[in-house]
Amino acid sequence: MVRAKRKLDHIEYALSTGQSRTHGFHDIDFVHQSLPNSSYETITCETKIGELSLSSPIFINAMTGGGGEKTLHINEQLAYVAKHHNLAMAVGSQMAALKDESEAASYKIIRKVNPNGIFFANLGSEATIEQAERAVDMIEANALQIHLNVIQELTMPEGDRDFTGVLQRIEKIVLNSKVPVIVKEVGFGMSKETMQQLASVGVTAIDIGGQGGTNFAAVENERRQRMLSYFNNWGIQTATSIIEATSTNNNLSFIASGGIQTALDVAKAIALGANTTAFAGYFLRILMEDGIEKLVDEIDLLHTDLKFIMTALGAKTIEELQSVPLVIKGETYHWLTQRGIDTTHYSRR
């Protein structure tokens, strides 16, 4: 019951605290092309995460599950939206269902709604090989997300305090998993050093989960008697984290998430080097406040606007969008300069 109550608290406080939108994309400007030599009708948006083919560079990221009927209903609706738009979808952490079988239905519902969909299972970095296998089997997942959430756990009143051995556990899961493993942050971003460590143990796909979206330090602080306010602005902004990712020069696929709400955010994230983008809090707010049809319509508009932007840039495919010239300025530029990451190749390609 404690875990289920926490799941419901997370939904409530994620909606009430909102998204900070401090993702850094305001520091990214595209170089206008007056002769794009492109046509809206021929733009295609297919992409890949590793060997996993996706019809869209937008997917529904991990949100919930394990909180009884309410979380079952949310996942049911999200799965319907994913089916309607042929989007991939991740579930929230399945540890609740591994600890209490009665909660499994809130995750299994997605496969009932969308039997042929692409779904990602989800567990924390404390998971064992056996738990990872059970989570994948529970929803017949196409991939497994392992989330890193140190700051959330430290801020959570009942959270973990020991983070030793995490990389070694991830390595074991990667070596034994029958599906691709995606390691993700939960809104605090990833540094190039972290990504290099993950690549060294065989991880091939990373969701950078940057600062700028749902702030899980703020969410957990709402549940505390004594707030750890120093964690409320902790992390690496989404745009910065994507560039840190691409600077590793590893053969990794990158997912951009963290405050992404618009087609321009999507286009900038991909142009910086992401293979796809993920939406969570923004979609949840629309679903909870305006209903499922409004969310379906919003995703239609996102795809339309993304194709308009790609047409303007002369990028006929997602791969071409990853090569358009752009200028990095402001705080993002200063951070990257201090970190010794060269940005000139973005503006001169």
UniProtKB/Swiss-Prot annotation:
Top enzyme category? isomerase
Q: Name one GO molecular function term.
A: isopentenyl-diphosphate delta-isomerase activity
Cellular compartments annotated = Cytoplasm
KW Transcription (keyword) present = no
Required co-factor(s) are: FMN; NADPH; Mg(2+)
Enzyme Commission (EC) number: 5.3.3.2
Which biological process annotations from GO are given for this protein? Answer: isoprenoid biosynthetic process
Keywords from UniProt, A to Z, are: Cytoplasm, Flavoprotein, FMN, Isomerase, Isoprene biosynthesis, Magnesium, Metal-binding, NADP
Q: What's the protein called, per UniProt?
A: Isopentenyl-diphosphate delta-isomerase
Q: Which organism is it from?
A: Bacillus cereus (strain ZK / E33L)
